[in-house]
Amino acid sequence: MKENIQSKEDLLDWIEALEYQLLFNGRNDTKLFAKEFIEHLNNKGLIDELTSNMPFENSISKDEESDYPGNWHIEEKIRHYIRWNALITVLKANKTLDLGGHISTYSSAATLYEVGFNHFFRGGNLSDMVYFQGHSSPGIYARSFLEGSISKQNLDNFRQEIDGKGLSSYPHPWLMPDYWQFPTVSMGLGPIMAIYQAHIMKYLEQRGLLQNEPNRKIWMFCGDGEMDEPESMGAISLAAREKLDNLIFVINCNLQRLDGPVRGNSRIITELGAIFKAAGWNVVNTIWGRKWDDLLAKDSTGALKWVMNNTVDGEYQNFKAKGGAYTRKHFFGKHPEALKLVE
């Protein structure tokens, strides 16, 4: 089909008008405008299907971010200590007794947990409830060691509980009643229990049977592989239907999938985001770290965002493993304008 020059000019006019709207009225008003416009097109029968896929970008842009409430550099140093202690805990247990244990789960989620511990989780009599991803337990123990609530002897006896001075492999309130609050292994138990915990608390609160702190939250930390378990997403529609605004899922998409290979070749973040969004959840993507901010600010053509949205998980794993030169060629090299950003 021949290119329609007039249609192309009209399209550019529409895009220019949208950019004007964004510049002078802001993101929120522009989102509302776009939503109503798309709904109008849909009502006219001009859109066959609406995608629920979110862009492979951070949901909160740089100019919308709040100032970080802590000292990032000090917190980063503490994270390094915790990661190291978690690593050594597992390695020592394997060196002599071949007991197993998980290293990469906590290593990839350390920032998520530390931001939570330092700035979100609240203690006290009516504290927040946290369902920790089971395989991340070495990191939680390592943090407690820095705080002084777990001894070196405890860490040395990871997965060695017979003498009474060890640490359970995973969150286990029966074996460690003064430490763990909820069991989250086998995989899939944590997500569905968190949903029903939030549900019963909301039920009791609305009937005056439970006095809660304002904004008391139930946090559920899990991995992308765990979301394959039928229990993990089996009740997510209930959470939306019952308006459980006291529930937060944090899904660490580290692409490891300990219990099996990936089942497709796209982006698991995009897939899960679409599923939760379609079920009625508010979905927030946190994908790109602050070191990408300068590059994204220079991306006036949108080429870098195009590359991000046209790269699949398997490629991202390659980029992480094969270094800068490979990434420059095969990631930024997908678009000439993106490549110019790193020349």
Annotate each language-model stretch with its function.
Residues 36-60, 133, 286, 290-297, ...:
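Terminal amphipathic helices with adjacent charged low-complexity linkers/tails
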Residues 7-41, 47:
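Amphipathic alpha-helical packing elements
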Residues 33, 39-42, 48-53, 188-190, ...:
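Long, compositionally biased, glycine/small-hydrophobic-enriched stretches that function as flexible linkers
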Residues 130-133, 246-254:
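Short internal beta-strands
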Residues 5, 253-343:
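Long, well-ordered, tryptophan-enriched scaffold segments
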Residues 64-82, 86-96, 102-242:
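Cofactor-binding active-site loop characterized by glycine-rich and histidine/acidic residues
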Residues 98, 103-106, 212, 221, ...:
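Conserved alpha/beta enzyme-core scaffolds, especially Rossmann-like or related mixed alpha/beta domains
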Residues 15, 146, 270-274:
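Short acidic/glycine-rich loops and adjacent helix/strand connectors
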